[in-house]
Amino acid sequence: MTEKLIFELGSPGRQGVLFPANDVPEIPPHELLPRDLIREQEVPLPEVSEGDAVRHFVRLSRMNFGVDVGFYPLGSCTMKYNPKVAEDAAGLSGFANIHPYQPDEISQGALQLMYETQQDLAEITGMDAFTLQPAAGAQGELTGMLIIKAYLESKGETGRNKVIVPDSAHGTNPATAALCGFKVVEVKSDQRGGVDLAALKQLLGPDVAALMLTNPSTLGLFEDNITEIAALVHQAGGLLYYDGANLNAIMGYARPGDMGFDVVHLNLHKTFGTPHGGGGPGSGPVGVKAELAPFLPKPVIIQREGNYLPDYHRPQSIGRVKAFFANFSVIVKAYTYLRSLGGKGLKEVSEHAVLNANYLMKQLSDHFRVPYQRTCMHEFVVSPPEDMKEQGIKTLDIAKRLLDYGYHPPTVYFPLIVEEALMFEPTETESKETLDEFAHNLIKVLAEARENPDKLRNAPYTTPIRRLDEVMAARKPLVGWFPE
């Protein structure tokens, strides 16, 4: 049953709250506010009772799907279970009730937590300094590329106006580079899914500012030639940027800084167990090697004479990228995750993430086309079997049918270089039984497609909204309600 909009509930004049009669003189709004700030018409608020409003939003909440509801194998998103102890930590009054304008002297606990988080992330990634300011991965990317741009300008290398990105890159990579004023150049992948070294050599030159790379890649493959790639980029005078979206695969085993990366951004809301989805809040810290540290956003939390304080005296800084001290509660949750697991636990996280991905890929390899015959890392990409084309079944149909089995679908049609791609990331927190059941049902969906293709083409059947007009949603997204 489709849920009505809250504006379609209730009736004119119905109130959710009855206020007592006003016992003070009313003052006309124009005597208190400039006329250009006063509404000329009443706001079209819904007129519903408190009970109807509560029921409406509870019904909506029961339609949500998240990691606390079921298996969520959305590739390149690391939808792992988020431990609830982190929520308890973030809710402690010392963290929840502080204000960013408090004096440093009475904010030492919060400042210490941020400082130690910076240090922990630097150790995990092999970087020398970190900022916690960026509010999400994309803003972290932007911050990292602005740091690279400022660094090159400080050296007088303003002619470096190109950024190289692989054809398997996250879409945010070229978008970020373009937003920073760089020209984006694509480098092709080789037959094994890695960066084509010959193609890279052709692109490198005195006009290249950086190569943006994810390792493991969005294909779920480790870049075997990473040290050679780093050497080539550095020999050409460029910098190597690490998109940390896939760090969950290598913690305790490999560090971007040791591979030759100069700048990294991370996603605390992916790798480090803080909830994400629905627009946030997130956290996208950025780490750099020592020579780029002066350009980090200010303030950076430092320790001096036993005290923790924000350092604003950074004349080469790119400036603030976020008000106050970032999404602080997310940092508290990530700190709790880091300290709960420790170094040994983080290493086991990556072990299990890689094990689960390879186990699931093996389960599906006889039923789907696997484009790269390699051991995967934390995620993998497959394509539907050839006979699905004969049935007129597309990746989207398979994904939609999975909804009826109670799963969130995998990422579809990405990376773009894989035909009809389905990208799975099971994460480390799923059991063997969950993976077995999921594989069984996914294979069952293929059998349904062969027996009755229309069953998939018309799926899903159990969701409140079945199939959106994808073109209209992309070109004319109406996400708000407006009175007729």
Curated annotation (Swiss-Prot):
NCBIfam families tied to this protein: PRK04366.1
EC number annotated for this UniProt entry: 1.4.4.2
InterPro entries named among the record's database cross-references: Aminotrans_V_dom, GcvPB, GDC-P_C, GDC_P, PyrdxlP-dep_Trfase, PyrdxlP-dep_Trfase_major, PyrdxlP-dep_Trfase_small
Taxonomic classification: Bacteria, Bacillati, Bacillota, Clostridia, Eubacteriales
Enzyme class: oxidoreductase
Name the UniProt record assigns to this protein: Probable glycine dehydrogenase (decarboxylating) subunit 2
An MF annotation (GO) of this entry: glycine dehydrogenase (decarboxylating) activity
Subunit structure: The glycine cleavage system is composed of four proteins: P, T, L and H. In this organism, the P 'protein' is a heterodimer of two subunits.
N6-(pyridoxal phosphate)lysine, modified sites: K270
Cofactor(s) annotated in UniProt: pyridoxal 5'-phosphate
Family, as annotated: Belongs to the GcvP family. C-terminal subunit subfamily.
Coiled coil (UniProt feature): none
Keyword annotations from UniProtKB, A to Z: Oxidoreductase, Pyridoxal phosphate
Pfam families linked to this entry: Aminotran_5, GcvP2_C
One term under GO cellular component: glycine cleavage complex
Entry superkingdom: Bacteria
GO BP: glycine decarboxylation via glycine cleavage system
Primary role: The glycine cleavage system catalyzes the degradation of glycine. The P protein binds the alpha-amino group of glycine through its pyridoxal phosphate cofactor; CO(2) is released and the remaining methylamine moiety is then transferred to the lipoamide cofactor of the H protein.
Catalytic activity, as annotated: N(6)-[(R)-lipoyl]-L-lysyl-[glycine-cleavage complex H protein] + glycine + H(+) = N(6)-[(R)-S(8)-aminomethyldihydrolipoyl]-L-lysyl-[glycine-cleavage complex H protein] + CO2
